[in-house]
A protein has these predicted regions:
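Sterile Alpha Motif
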Residues: 1-29, 38-95
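Short amphipathic alpha-helical interaction elements and helix-loop-helix interfaces
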Residues: 20, 32, 43-47
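A short amphipathic alpha-helix within small helical-bundle interaction modules
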Residues: 26, 33-40
């Protein structure tokens, strides 16, 4: 199983990014793996406007943009997005 689809690895990533307390709520929202969390919002890391991320992820978790855990969620989302993109790239190269 790849890191993208591992629930255990997602939990570890939550811990590493300081948002382990949000893990149960992330799972309830259906975001139990990096692959699922990567597509929880239309936001693409690096774009100036992170409004979609704030609205679709942060606010849905009952947090506001100024919550200290928001930066951890951003890092987790970035990791999820880059892991999923790398996995897709790998699959395309082997097909």
């Amino acid at each position: 199983m790849s890191m993208e689809h591992s629930t255990a690895y997602f939990r570890e990533c939550c811990a590493n990014n300081g948002v382990l307390d949000l893990h149960p709520e992330l799972v309830k929202k259906g975001w139990a793996t990096l692959g699922k969390f990567a597509f929880s919002s239309s936001y693409i890391p690096g774009h100036v406007d992170d409004g979609p991320f704030i609205k679709k992820v942060v606010n849905r978790l009952g947090l506001d943009e100024d919550d200290e855990r928001t930066s951890g969620l951003r890092r987790l989302f970035y990791e999820a997005f880059t892991t999923s993109a790398a996995e897709m790239r790998r699959r395309l190269k082997t097909s």
